[in-house]
C-alpha cells in the first residue's frame, strides 16, 4: 500500500471518529441534557438585570469585604508534607484572624481540589456574617435568615454538612442591601 493511500485511509478514519464522537454521541447527549436539566445544560448561568454575572457551578473570587468570600482558588497541588502548603495555610489563617475569625473553618484555609469550588460550608459562611453585617450595616439576624434560605446539601459523598453557593448568596445579599436601603426613611 502506498504512502498516499495510507494517508487517505488515516484521514478518513480520523473524520469518521470525529463524526462519531462529536456528532453521533455528543449532540444527542446535549439534547437529552437540555430536556432533563435545561439550566445545567446551559451552564447554570446566574443573571442580574438580564446580564450574566457568573456561573452557579464555578467559584469566583470576591475582593470586597462586603461579600461572602469563597474558598481559596488556584490549587497548588502541593503534598501535605510540603512546607510551602503549611506556610500558605498559616498565612491564610492569620489573614482571617486579622479579620476577626479566631479559628477559621478548614474550607476558608484550604484550596478545593478543583480550585473553582462554588460552595462554602455553613460554618465558614457563618463565621463571615459579623463582617458582612458591619460592612453592609445590616442586622446579623437578617443575614442568618438569608443564609438559611440559601442552604443546600449536603452535596455528594464527601460533604457531611450543608453548604451555601457563594455567588448565589452574594447576589441575594446585594438584593437585600438594596431593599434595606430603600426602606430607610429619608434624612
Positions of predicted regions on the chain:
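Flexible, solvent-exposed loop/hinge segments and secondary-structure transition points
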Residues: 5, 9, 22, 29-128, ...
Amino acid at each position: 500500500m502506498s504512502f498516499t493511500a495510507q494517508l487517505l485511509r488515516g484521514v478518513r478514519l480520523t473524520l469518521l471518529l470525529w463524526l462519531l464522537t462529536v456528532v453521533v454521541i455528543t449532540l444527542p447527549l446535549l439534547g437529552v441534557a437540555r430536556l432533563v436539566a435545561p439550566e445545567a445544560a446551559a451552564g447554570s448561568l446566574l443573571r442580574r438585570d438580564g446580564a450574566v454575572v457568573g456561573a452557579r457551578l464555578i467559584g469566583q473570587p470576591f475582593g470586597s469585604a462586603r461579600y461572602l468570600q469563597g474558598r481559596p482558588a488556584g490549587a497548588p497541588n502541593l503534598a501535605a508534607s510540603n512546607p510551602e502548603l503549611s506556610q500558605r495555610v498559616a498565612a491564610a489563617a492569620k489573614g482571617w484572624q486579622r479579620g476577626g475569625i479566631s479559628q477559621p473553618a478548614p474550607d476558608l484555609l484550604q484550596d478545593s481540589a478543583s480550585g473553582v469550588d462554588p460552595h462554602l460550608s455553613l460554618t465558614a459562611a457563618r463565621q463571615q456574617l459579623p463582617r458582612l453585617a458591619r460592612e453592609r450595616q445590616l442586622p446579623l439576624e437578617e443575614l442568618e435568615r438569608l443564609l438559611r434560605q440559601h442552604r443546600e446539601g449536603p452535596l455528594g459523598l464527601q460533604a457531611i454538612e450543608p453548604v451555601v453557593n457563594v455567588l448565589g448568596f452574594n447576589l441575594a445579599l446585594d438584593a437585600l442591601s438594596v431593599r434595606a436601603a430603600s426602606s430607610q426613611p429619608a434624612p
